[in-house]
Regions:
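Polyanion-binding loop/helix "lid" in catalytic or ligand-binding cores
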Residues: 200-248
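Extreme N-terminal cap/leader segments of soluble proteins
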Residues: 1-72, 91, 100, 348
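Glycine-rich anion/phosphate-binding loops
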Residues: 37, 69-85, 108-118, 156
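Glycine-rich anion-binding loops of enzyme active sites
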Residues: 50, 60, 95-189, 318
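Residue-level recognition of short, solvent-exposed, well-ordered loop/turn junctions
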Residues: 38, 94, 159, 165-166, ...
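Small-aliphatic-rich amphipathic alpha-helix that forms the alpha element of a beta-alpha
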Residues: 73-97, 118-126, 225, 244-250
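Short, compositionally biased
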Residues: 182-199, 203
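Glycine-/charge-enriched secondary-structure boundary and capping motifs
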Residues: 2-19, 23-29, 107-130, 138-145, ...
Length: 348
C-alpha cells in the first residue's frame, strides 16, 4: 500500500502544475543585480541599465538532439543550459538569466523531472545564472526542453558574425572533434547493449570524449581572457554544428573567404585515439562533428602576438577578400574546399 502511494506521488498526472513548479524551483535563488523579480509572478522583471540585452533560445528534442538510453537526465539538464550560454558568450556578452520550459510524456515521473532540474541548478550555479521563469506541460510523445537565455553587454563591445575583415586572423579555443567521437562510442555501446543487455563495457579509456558529449562546458573563460588582454574580436561564433559549418557562417556573414591550415586544427590526443579505433580521420571529426561549444573568432592582425603563445587559443588561418573560396590547406599543401557538412537537424 505504501509503495502504491509513493508511486502515485511520483506520477506527474497527480501533481498540480503550481505545486510542481514550486517543488522544482524552490531551491533556486536570484543573485544577479539585473534580476528584479524572478519566479512566482506572471512574468519576470529585469533591469539591464544602459547595457544591450542579448537573447538566445535553443530547443532540445528527444530522438533528435539526445538519446536517453545513454544521456543521464541530470547531464541533459546541465547541457540544455550550456548550449544557450554558449550562444550568449559568442556575442561577447555575459549571460545572467534563463527561462526553462519542459514538455514530458506520461512515461516520465516526478523524479525524472527533478533530475533534469538538478542539472539545470548545477549549470545555473556554474555560470551564475538566475532561473526567472518557464513552463512545464505534458507531451504526447517524448521529452522536449526549451531554454531561453538572456545576457547583457556594453553596446560598444558586442560581437556579431559579420565583422571580419580582409587580413584578420581566425582563432579557435580549446580542441575539436571530441564530442563527436564521444557520440560514436555511446552509439556503438548502445548497439552492443541492444544485442546483449548483460554487457558491462569498460568505458574508462573514453572518459574525455564521452564527457565532451554528455556534459560540455561553455567557454566563459575565453571571453574573460580576451577582455583581460584588451582584445575585441571582429567576429565570433560558437562551434555547435562543426568547424566547417561555422567557418561558412562567419565567411558568408562577413562577405569574404577564410583559409585554414589542417595542421593548426587542435585535436586532443584522446580524440585521436578514438578516431583511430573507429577508422575516422581526426580532421573530419573536427570539421564536421559539432557540439564542441568552443569559440571561433577573428581578430585584427595587430592582436595576433597577444595570443600567439597562449594555450587557450590556436590560430587556424586568416580571412581573404576573395569571396566563395573557403578552403583548408592540408599538411602536404593540397587546397581543399570547405563545405558545410556539419550537423543539421533537418538533414538527420
Amino acid at each position: 500500500m505504501e509503495k502504491e502511494e509513493a508511486n502515485n506521488e511520483n506520477d506527474l498526472s497527480n501533481i498540480k502544475e503550481t505545486v510542481l513548479i514550486k517543488k522544482l524551483t524552490k531551491s533556486f535563488k536570484v543573485s544577479n543585480k539585473s534580476s528584479i523579480l524572478g519566479i512566482g509572478d506572471d512574468a519576470a522583471v529585469l533591469n539591464f541599465d544602459n547595457q544591450e540585452v542579448v537573447i538566445s533560445k535553443d530547443m532540445l528534442v528527444e530522438g533528435v538532439h539526445f538519446d536517453l538510453s545513454y544521456m543521464p537526465l541530470k547531464h541533459l539538464g546541465y547541457k540544455s543550459i550550456v548550449v544557450n550560454v554558449s550562444d550568449i558568450l559568442a556575442m561577447n556578452a555575459s549571460p545572467s538569466q534563463v527561462l526553462v520550459s519542459i514538455a514530458a510524456s506520461n512515461r516520465f515521473k516526478l523524479d525524472a523531472i527533478e533530475a533534469i532540474y538538478d542539472g539545470i541548478r548545477a549549470a545555473c550555479s556554474e555560470y551564475n545564472l538566475d532561473l526567472v521563469g518557464g513552463d512545464t506541460t505534458s507531451s504526447n510523445k517524448g521529452l522536449i526542453i526549451s531554454v531561453t537565455c538572456l545576457g547583457s553587454i556594453n553596446k560598444k563591445k558586442f560581437v556579431t558574425r559579420s565583422g571580419a575583415k580582409d587580413g584578420d586572423i581566425l582563432v579557435v579555443s580549446g580542441d575539436l572533434g571530441g564530442s563527436y567521437m564521444g557520440l560514436q562510442v555511446l552509439e556503438r555501446e548502445k548497439s552492443v547493449f541492444e544485442v546483449n543487455p548483460n554487457s558491462q563495457p569498460d568505458l574508462s579509456e573514453y572518459t574525455y570524449c564521452i564527457q565532451r558529449q554528455l556534459k560540455p562546458e561553455a567557454r566563459k573563460d575565453i571571453v574573460k581572457a580576451l577582455d583581460d588582454m584588451d582584445i575585441l574580436p571582429t567576429s565570433m561564433i560558437d562551434i555547435s554544428d562543426g568547424l566547417s559549418t561555422e567557418i561558412n557562417h562567419l565567411s558568408s556573414s562577413s562577405d569574404l573567404s577564410i583559409h585554414i591550415y589542417e595542421d593548426k586544427i587542435p585535436i586532443a590526443e584522446e580524440t585521436k585515439k578514438v578516431c583511430d579505433e573507429f577508422g575516422i580521420n581526426p580532421t573530419v571529426a573536427a570539421l564536421n562533428g559539432g557540439e564542441d561549444y568552443e569559440l571561433l573568432f577573428t581578430i585584427s592582425k595587430k592582436n595576433s602576438k597577444k595570443i600567439a603563445n597562449n594555450s587557450l587559443f590556436r590560430i587556424l588561418g586568416s580571412c581573404k577578400k576573395k569571396k566563395n573560396d573557403n578552403c583548408m590547406i592540408t599538411s602536404i599543401g593540397q587546397k581543399i574546399n570547405i563545405s558545410s557538412d556539419g550537423w543539421d537537424p533537418f538533414n538527420k
